[in-house]
């Protein structure tokens, strides 16, 4: 799979831009604040209809314009698939093969991407929300139904929180409704939990040998999904019964707080090296090796799930890796993954990579191919 071309209209600082890409390595070179990351963000948006930088759609639309628009041609399995995404003040519209998609979950998955940015180095050390967003993004593009389930979960969670708030304020409401919402909540929560736990299991299977190799055989990586329920066995009904029991035990505390206290929105993923929690005890080098191993594992996992390698976006991250980790990253993707790199200088990039790369010079919203 690779992105053959992209067209941007009124997106960020690009009023009118058309680019054609190499199926191997593409380097966006320029000073800071010139628009390099905006280009990678456009590719990410074209793939996921979401950004790694903001959740506010208005941020994408150029000042005093009505909408931002992206078009791309994706080559997969020998066929070209046109994608279109328009962003307005009222929301997003998406097309595949020029046909409008009723839901964004039907659009996502036509272009698979893995992004590795400096903030991804905090995947291990950062707050649990960082890891939950990571799971939502990666599972969502491989299993579009997951995005539908996630949206349903967020809707029920919001309703349940509103109802708990009313009970907290001692308004006259039907107490039976909380039990109904809790039952609905548990059904969708277990669905998400199962998909996340399965994903983590597969991710570990790919990440562990990569980490073992990067650490020169000195470290063993384990990844655990820390769920609100006890993940005994494979029966979701058992998990659901456990969740309902726990929710019943904290019902009064939730009413007192006016918020749902357990569920996938509170779950986390834990990383262990040689049995030690990397979040708490890992060195910066171990945390970076773990993040790199996970990103490389994503590439292989997407390939297993979809039959195609994803597009890799490296947003100013090569300068954050030492020569050894950088060479391992570039060696792992060479010849099989279309890669987009942003950088302020080519001095930190492997010479073999540069020789096969197409370089674009970025300055004040203009892009010139070398």
UniProtKB/Swiss-Prot annotation:
Gene3D superfamilies, sorted: P-loop containing nucleotide triphosphate hydrolases, RecF/RecN/SMC, N-terminal domain
Name of the gene: recF
Keyword Calcium on entry: no
One Gene Ontology term from the biological process aspect of the record: double-strand break repair
Pfam families reported in the protein's UniProt record: SMC_N (PF02463)
SUPFAM superfamilies for this protein: P-loop containing nucleoside triphosphate hydrolases
Residues binding ATP, per UniProt: 30-37
Species lineage: Bacteria, Bacillati, Bacillota, Bacilli, Bacillales
Function: The RecF protein is involved in DNA metabolism; it is required for DNA replication and normal SOS inducibility. RecF binds preferentially to single-stranded, linear DNA. It also seems to bind ATP.
PANTHER family according to UniProt: DNA REPLICATION AND REPAIR PROTEIN RECF (PTHR32182:SF0)
Localization: Cytoplasm
Name the UniProt record assigns to this protein: DNA replication and repair protein RecF
One GO CC annotation: cytoplasm
UniProt GO MF annotations: ATP binding; single-stranded DNA binding
